[in-house]
């Protein structure tokens, strides 16, 4: 067999023509320590802060601490099978989660993976969990109400679309119930809801999901769940993952409501990670940037300008207090970031006033601009009346000789408290809220015994549904009160036919 020089030279020329001098470089580090949800790796000299890293076993982590000798990594998911000496490599991207309509009606973990046993989520879109908040000129003032269906909130501390309203109170005062009822009331309102459960017991989350399913609310809700058995990094990233899912809808011109239940547990998880990464502790052992932890999250909630589609992301963060102390570190931080707070008091809760909203300490700084005119008119004096009643109530127990005006204020106050009570999972449409508050503020309830107020309200609603639906329609569609004489006459007619219970 003879070797021809021409053939060899043509083969070499062919190879040279297709030669590619691009090198595929993977920067790989070695794990030097692993434990409690964090790892340290040596050799990742060019890694970026917040970059996603991949371990040999397929797990992912986020570069959190960039030090001279090694990198501190928080591990996403299980870390039992990561060993010292394992390799970890850069991915060149930051953490992203799947987003879009495919997630609606599903229960997912903070990585966007389904945990409801309903199969794979087919979503081809992703968003980074950390994103820049909309700028000053990208926003507009809150001008559209987000009705919660809860009389005490819609009348006293109204919430607008794009607002951040904190729900704060001790454990077992009804914080989660308020948020769930608000989600239930969004049915038919064209609002997408996201419930982020951070460190909540698996059984509790299961109960909430069943409630949402029972009332048909899972048709427009995404549940993001990071249970107490999950490693701390999962609890830390859960609110950011939920916000990224909400932003996808917001930037497409839709209205979104997101509930963080609760941010106290996220702060505790972040403190745990920071101490394990040996960051210097500050007040209450929280790291120095714990304020930024929550501010960069909540600033992403906004009412976008019309130029950007006019979508909104309304946030209801929940914070748990100890013995009603709202002056602790995390509560004061979040109060200063949000646009108002709903303060729930255990004394009121155990006295049977539910929802246990403390009108004196609760405030909505921007929601008043979004409140409908009819509600603004009927609820105008409600807060001051309620505060005055609370003061009078404490004085009244010391003596029985009260003048007529004081007695009238006490009677009105008792009826106000009774009207604002509301059973669980029973949101009331805004037009019916306006109706009962109109009856209250115009004195139609003054002669009704306190124990009959609830029955009076239900029968009044039924009466208007059957005989005066046009008046309710006017309030619902225009946001204004109908003709004063007509409304008063209808309520008066019903009041005269109402029979109080026999004692």
Curated annotation (Swiss-Prot):
Regulation: Increases 2-fold following exposure to low pH.
InterPro entries, A to Z: ATP_synth_asu-like_sf, ATP_synth_asu_C, ATP_synth_asu_C_sf, ATP_synth_F1_a_nt-bd_dom, ATP_synth_F1_asu, ATPase_a/bsu_AS, ATPase_F1/V1/A1_a/bsu_N, ATPase_F1/V1/A1_a/bsu_N_sf
EC main group: translocase
Site (Required for activity): 362
Highest rank taxon of the organism: Bacteria
GO cellular component, one term: plasma membrane
Keywords per UniProt: ATP synthesis, ATP-binding, Cell membrane, CF(1), Hydrogen ion transport, Ion transport, Membrane, Nucleotide-binding, Translocase, Transport
Localization of this protein: Cell membrane
Principal location class: membrane
Record membrane topology: Peripheral membrane protein
Gene induction: By low pH.
One Pfam family in the UniProt entry: ATP-synt_ab_N
Keyword Nucleotide-binding carried by entry: yes
Catalysed reactions, as listed in the record: ATP + H2O + 4 H(+)(in) = ADP + phosphate + 5 H(+)(out)
NCBIfam families according to UniProt: atpA, PRK13343.1
Subunit and interaction comment: F-type ATPases have 2 components, CF(1) - the catalytic core - and CF(0) - the membrane proton channel. CF(1) has five subunits: alpha(3), beta(3), gamma(1), delta(1), epsilon(1). CF(0) has three main subunits: a(1), b(2) and c(9-12). The alpha and beta chains form an alternating ring which encloses part of the gamma chain. CF(1) is attached to CF(0) by a central stalk formed by the gamma and epsilon chains, while a peripheral stalk is formed by the delta and b chains.
Stated family: Belongs to the ATPase alpha/beta chains family.
Protein name, as recorded: ATP synthase subunit alpha
Organism: Lactobacillus acidophilus (strain ATCC 700396 / NCK56 / N2 / NCFM)
């Amino acid at each position: 067999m003879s070797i021809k020089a021409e053939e060899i030279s043509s083969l070499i020329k062919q190879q040279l023509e297709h030669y590619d001098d691009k090198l595929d470089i993977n920067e790989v580090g070695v794990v030097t320590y692993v434990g409690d949800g964090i790892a340290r790796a040596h050799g990742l000299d060019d890694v970026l802060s917040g970059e996603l890293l991949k371990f040999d076993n397929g797990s992912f982590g986020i570069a959190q601490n960039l030090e001279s000798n090694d990198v501190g990594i928080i591990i996403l998911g299980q870390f039992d099978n990561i060993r010292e000496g394992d390799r970890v490599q850069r991915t060149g991207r930051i953490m992203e989660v799947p987003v879009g309509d495919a997630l609606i009606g599903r229960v997912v973990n903070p990585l966007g993976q389904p945990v409801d046993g309903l199969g794979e989520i087919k979503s081809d879109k992703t968003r980074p969990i950390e994103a820049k908040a909309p700028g000053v000129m990208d926003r507009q003032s809150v001008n559209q109400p987000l009705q919660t269906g809860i009389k005490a909130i819609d009348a006293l501390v109204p919430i607008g679309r794009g607002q951040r309203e904190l729900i704060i109170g001790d454990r077992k005062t009804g914080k989660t119930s308020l948020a769930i009822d608000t989600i239930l009331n969004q049915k038919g309102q064209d609002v997408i809801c996201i419930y982020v459960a951070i460190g909540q017991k698996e059984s509790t989350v299961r109960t909430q999901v069943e409630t949402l399913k029972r009332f048909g609310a899972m048709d427009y809700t995404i549940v993001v769940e990071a249970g107490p058995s999950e490693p701390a990094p999962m609890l830390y990233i859960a609110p950011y993952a939920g916000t990224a899912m909400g932003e996808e809808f917001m930037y497409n011109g839709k209205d979104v409501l997101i509930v963080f239940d609760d941010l106290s547990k996220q702060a505790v998880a972040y403190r745990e990670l920071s101490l394990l990464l040996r960051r210097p502790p500050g007040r209450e052992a929280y790291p120095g940037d714990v304020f930024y932890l929550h501010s960069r999250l909540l600033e992403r909630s906004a009412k976008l300008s019309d130029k950007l589609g006019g979508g909104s992301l309304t946030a209801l963060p929940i914070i748990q207090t100890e013995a009603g102390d709202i002056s602790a570190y995390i509560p004061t931080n979040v109060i200063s970031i949000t646009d108002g707070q709903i303060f729930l008091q255990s004394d009121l809760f155990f006295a049977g006033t539910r929802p246990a909203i403390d009108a004196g300490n609760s405030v909505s700084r921007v929601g008043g601009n979004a409140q409908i005119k009819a509600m603004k008119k009927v609820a105008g004096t409600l807060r001051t009346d309620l505060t005055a009643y609370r003061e009078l109530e404490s004085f009244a127990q010391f003596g029985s000789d009260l003048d007529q005006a004081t007695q009238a204020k006490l009677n009105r106050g008792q009826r106000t408290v009774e009207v604002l009570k509301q059973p669980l999972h029973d949101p009331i449409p805004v037009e019916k809220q306006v109706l009962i508050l109109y009856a209250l503020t115009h004195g139609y309830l003054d002669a009704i015994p306190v124990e009959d107020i609830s029955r009076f309200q239900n029968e009044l609603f039924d009466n208007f549904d059957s005989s005066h639906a046009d008046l309710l329609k006017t309030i619902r569609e225009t946001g204004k009160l109908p003709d004063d004489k007509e409304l008063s006459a209808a309520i008066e007619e019903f009041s005269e036919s109402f029979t109080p219970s026999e004692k």
